[in-house]
């Protein structure tokens, strides 16, 4: 998921440099959502790993 967030971030930067502000804003929004979803999943797995004391993966 982080890979897709980075891809959409790069798309938004390139689109912003070329003047396509609508595309840049859309891609940046998608990248932000994917990043926060990946961060939430990471934190949930981290908390379960610490609380249960087992290796999750």
Curated annotation (Swiss-Prot):
Superkingdom in the source lineage: Bacteria
Keywords per UniProt: Cell membrane, Membrane, Transmembrane, Transmembrane helix
A single Gene Ontology CC term: plasma membrane
Location of this chain's protein in the cell: Cell membrane
Transmembrane parts of this sequence: 4-24, 37-57
InterPro entries linked: DUF1328
Principal subcellular localization: membrane
Membrane topology category: Multi-pass membrane protein
The family this protein is said to belong to: Belongs to the UPF0391 family.
HAMAP family: UPF0391
Name of this chain's protein: UPF0391 membrane protein AZOSEA39630
